[in-house]
Amino acid sequence: MTSSIATLVHRYFSAYETRDRQVLEGMLDESFTFSSPLDDRIGRAAYFARCWPTSGTLRRFTVEKMFAQGDEAFIRYEAESATGRKFRNTEWLRFEGGKLVELQVYFGRDTRPAAPLPVLTPSPRMADWPATAALFPR
């Protein structure tokens, strides 16, 4: 079952990449629920109203890790927007009878190379605070 779950996961992301709503609609069970930090177990109709409009802003999904067991998969992926912005998320997907019945998304971070952190220089007033002074030995 694990290999077929992997196939379903890749088909799900491919539907977003190709903006094929018909494929995605065929994958989601009528009882489908979606949760994220912004959504709490919304149903199919709300999912398509809230989430599908962003499909036009996403260019590519690269699955970096996938753990599948039974009818469930947990994945980490990097997504790339149409503007080139990249970010990483994780998702837990649960299938029944080949249909996606539950999806939970956990938002990650921007994966563009970070600018170097600025070098901190202590102000004279900071030296008066013992805890702060320990961070900046003279």
Predicted regions and their residues:
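A beta-strand edge to alpha-helix "cap/lid" segment located at domain peripheries
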Residues: 4, 35-37, 48-138
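Short, well-ordered alpha-helical segments enriched in acidic and aromatic residues
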Residues: 8, 18-31, 35
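Amphipathic alpha-helical repeat scaffolds
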Residues: 10-14
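A structural signal for short, well-ordered beta-strand elements
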Residues: 17, 40-41
